[in-house]
Amino acid sequence: MGCVQCKDKEATKLTEERDGSLNQSSGFRYGTDPTPQHYPSFGVTSIPNYNNFHAAGGQGLTVFGGVSSSSHTGTLRTRGGTGVTLFVALYDYEARTEDDLSFHKGEKFQILNSSEGDWWEARSLTTGETGYIPSNYVAPVDSIQAEEWYFGKLGRKDAERQLLSFGNPRGTFLIRESETTKGAYSLSIRDWDDMKGDHVKHYKIRKLDNGGYYITTRAQFETLQQLVQHYSERAAGLCCRLVVPCHKGMPRLTDLSVKTKDVWEIPRESLQLIKRLGNGQFGEVWMGTWNGNTKVAIKTLKPGTMSPESFLEEAQIMKKLKHDKLVQLYAVVSEEPIYIVTEYMNKGSLLDFLKDGEGRALKLPNLVDMAAQVAAGMAYIERMNYIHRDLRSANILVGNGLICKIADFGLARLIEDNEYTARQGAKFPIKWTAPEAALYGRFTIKSDVWSFGILLTELVTKGRVPYPGMNNREVLEQVERGYRMPCPQDCPISLHELMIHCWKKDPEERPTFEYLQGFLEDYFTATEPQYQPGENL
């Protein structure tokens, strides 16, 4: 079905590709490869680039009067005959404020203004109501972005994480943008065999000069939808036929609402503390709600922990850091007691998860994957020229599907408690801190790398305190003399060697987080081709 060209002669196997394979000598890790496409003008001030519509914004949409709609074509026709693309809801959404629109999956919208970035002003063609909608909940009607199986800019490793989630059968699949080839896509399929058990195979989808698509030149298609239909009916050389699109899960919002996008100092009265999750040296962490309808995590700081003015200044920077491996800062209450409002992670801290939760039963592949996620978040912090200063398992939060996110980045610099600022006081995390930072206050991204090496020991020992049997003073003295923790029980030598690399005395000899991410993501697959040639393709 939809096959434009089928050659009778037996097809040759697709060439193996080692896209993104580990290169330890250079620390290479493949990067994302955007796929710019050009769309016709629709006679409006601005329509987002459909291939990057989630990040669109900066210009307003001006829609002309006298509009009639066409559900079939996915456009609105103005009196002048120009078309305005309609958008369709990919998920249900419940309004959080009076400015938002509630809507259901499948509902169609006319976009009135996209100048608010992540929040677009829209009119529902179902209800006729106007309000703001989150832009990553919608896609242009009839576009590939509106397909259940299209995941856009999703990396190979994240594709594998999603496909290997519990409950997905063999043949679960998704299509994503190629990370290395402009205009191309990758098809990722969950497979199973006796040797490997559950695993994921990746196939390159290439683009023809005339706009078609193919995995093998013997079977070419006008659209990706036709390609998916073809391989849903037969394996035709793939590891198996395409059975069901991978479940996407709800997209993450980086703001509580359109109003808190820029004005994110919120009144204390808008927050409700519901369940205390933890109690630390400098405050408490609560599960709560904002506006009575949005679940959030709320960190409350003891008065005197840090200057409200300094905190607000740092929070301005923290709010701009947006990455799916960082806990998103939503809002703050900057008067003491300071409240920090972030996204809620339902499995709690990585430390508690490893010691007392589901993490106790995890095997090495899961633990290494969690380390890779932390490294990915830290690689972003590295690219942004930021420093965490307190990287350890207690400051990593865990969600469903073993998703890990980094919390409390940048806050350690602001703490004014004497027991902490002395750097060798009882409250200072000596065992995680690089010697140049503990002794001389030289905190850099390379001191974060040292801390990451300590975090690796926490992972493989399921939350054991580093340097067992040694107090803070002994640790500082011994590390200065060259002592490094030995290889933990059941830890592979290669992983311990990576820890030792993180603990080099000279900070500049320590690896980058980009290298650490690549090493850990490819830890179990570095010797295998990442893209499959297929059989009889």
Curated annotation (Swiss-Prot):
Inhibited by phosphorylation of Tyr-531 by leukocyte common antigen and activated by dephosphorylation of this site. The modification Phosphothreonine is found at residue 12. Autophosphorylated at Tyr-420. Phosphorylation on the C-terminal tail at Tyr-531 by CSK maintains the enzyme in an inactive state. PTPRC/CD45 dephosphorylates Tyr-531 leading to activation. Ultraviolet B (UVB) strongly increase phosphorylation at Thr-12 and kinase activity, and promotes translocation from the cytoplasm to the nucleus. Dephosphorylation at Tyr-420 by PTPN2 negatively regulates T-cell receptor signaling. Phosphorylated at tyrosine residues, which can be enhanced by NTN1. Disulfide bonds: none annotated. Keywords: Adaptive immunity, ATP-binding, Cell membrane, Cytoplasm, Developmental protein, Immunity, Kinase, Lipoprotein, Manganese, Membrane, Metal-binding, Myristate, Nucleotide-binding, Nucleus, Palmitate, Phosphoprotein, SH2 domain, SH3 domain, Transferase, Tyrosine-protein kinase. Its cofactor is Mn(2+). This is Tyrosine-protein kinase Fyn. It comes from Sus scrofa.
